[in-house]
């Protein structure tokens, strides 16, 4: 009988402990909700609960998300108050909806078809319904003005969740091992993966990387690859005939054995012809003969004292630019800041922020500051525009906002 009461008491103790743990959890959640409401004034407890559940009850993240997306949270509350309290995954998936104006609706194959028809690169975004990183990507990257402008005329964005059939097929085919969110660019014609981002994805870095695809669309990329293959094939065919080629220092074992036998026999020794000297002499003769046939002979460069003083003066004037101002900080209001990506002749790319109200001459100052001393000479800036290009005027009296240069790709070319 005593044993029976002992087991009963043990069961009651376990039940009491579980109830106590649950009450402690609820008490802590109520504390977090109260703390949130002290910071987010005039908000409801339901708003606080939704945000805290979205961030796994992390008060700092919940407050940060609220402060940066206050308007979006009202939509979250409206769309989720009608749901059940257990449906946290569904509620979380609506916290940061992707901006519909940059997304392509439909299946993957149709997105590829549209990309091919419009000659646009296809950006695939593998998302998670529950991971906070996916919602932050929607909020901080896809909703970013610079990202939207970069994507607008060069890319199609197709988003898919990792728990869907299409999402699983994409993960398997492209061997995606990183957890969502994952973003990658593919050539819709070949399906080749060109570039990929995963983990914490910053808006500035993805803009800079995406601008590399502005130079050419998928069709031009395929044409370039085809030309390269044809060139390689032609070079291979020509090299197989060994026309006008100087023999390599080593001919291989069987040729060396033949040479040794030939030297031992002291008979007619065959020496491979070398065309290098004859070609050099011929080229030199052709150069000088062409010079003698024209009166417009231009002497070689003889030093600075032989340069036209007017040209030197003009070049020096062109290289005088205003003092470069300090770059706006990250906490600056986005509505007054623009970002530009500059591509230099040596292939380097630099990104720089300017105030929209600043004069465009500062762009020349920025470019000049990143050119090596040995290469500093007159240059011009060209704005990359799909299907065309626009040479910028250094003397134009305009701001970045007025000129339309905000969030564009600029190329530095020599005069």
From Swiss-Prot:
Gene3D superfamilies assigned: DNA helicase RuvA subunit, C-terminal domain, Glutaredoxin, Phosphatidylinositol 3-kinase Catalytic Subunit, Chain A, domain 1
Protein known as: Plant UBX domain-containing protein 16
Keywords: Ubl conjugation pathway
GO biological process, one term: proteasome-mediated ubiquitin-dependent protein catabolic process
Residue span(s) of domain UBA: 19-69
Keyword field contains Endoplasmic reticulum: no
Gene name of the encoded protein: PUX16
UBX domain span: 333-413
A GO CC annotation given for this chain: nucleus
């Amino acid at each position: 009988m005593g044993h029976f009461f002992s087991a009963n008491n043990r069961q009651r103790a376990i039940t009491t402990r579980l109830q106590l743990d649950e009450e402690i959890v609820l008490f802590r959640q109520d504390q977090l909700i109260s703390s949130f409401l002290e910071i987010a004034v005039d908000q409801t407890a339901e708003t606080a609960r939704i945000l805290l559940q979205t961030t796994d009850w992390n008060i700092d993240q919940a407050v940060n998300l609220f402060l940066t997306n206050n308007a979006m949270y009202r939509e979250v509350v409206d769309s989720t108050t009608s749901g059940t309290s257990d449906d946290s995954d569904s509620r979380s998936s609506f916290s940061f909806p992707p901006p519909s104006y940059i997304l392509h609706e439909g299946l993957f194959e149709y997105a590829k078809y549209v990309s091919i028809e419009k000659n646009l690169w296809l950006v695939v975004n593998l998302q998670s319904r529950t991971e906070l990183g996916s919602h932050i990507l929607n909020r901080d990257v896809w909703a970013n003005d610079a990202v939207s402008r970069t994507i607008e005329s060069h890319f199609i964005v197709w988003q898919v969740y990792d728990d869907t059939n299409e999402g699983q097929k994409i993960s398997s085919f492209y061997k995606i091992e990183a957890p969502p969110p994952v973003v990658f660019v593919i050539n819709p014609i070949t399906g080749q993966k060109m570039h990929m981002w995963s983990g914490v994805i910053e808006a500035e870095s993805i803009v800079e990387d995406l601008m590399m695809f502005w130079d050419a669309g998928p069709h031009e990329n395929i044409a370039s690859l085809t030309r390269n293959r044809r060139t390689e094939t032609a070079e291979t065919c020509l090299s197989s005939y060994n026309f006008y080629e100087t023999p390599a220092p080593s001919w291989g074992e069987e040729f060396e054995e033949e040479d040794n036998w030939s030297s031992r026999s002291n008979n007619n020794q065959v020496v491979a012809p070398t065309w290098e000297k004859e070609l050099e002499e011929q080229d030199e003769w052709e150069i000088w003969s062409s010079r003698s046939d024209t009166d417009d002979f231009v002497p070689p460069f003889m030093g600075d004292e032989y340069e036209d003083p007017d040209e030197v003066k003009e070049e020096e004037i062109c290289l005088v630019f205003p003092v470069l101002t300090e770059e706006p900080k990250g906490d600056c209001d986005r509505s007054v800041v623009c970002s530009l990506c500059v591509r230099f002749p040596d292939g380097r790319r630099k990104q720089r922020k300017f105030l929209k109200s600043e004069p465009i001459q500062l762009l020349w100052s920025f470019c000049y500051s990143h050119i090596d001393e040995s290469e500093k000479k007159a240059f011009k800036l060209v704005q990359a525009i799909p299907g065309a290009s626009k040479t910028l005027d250094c003397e134009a009296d305009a701001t970045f906002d007025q000129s339309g240069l905000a969030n564009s790709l600029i190329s530095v070319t020599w005069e």
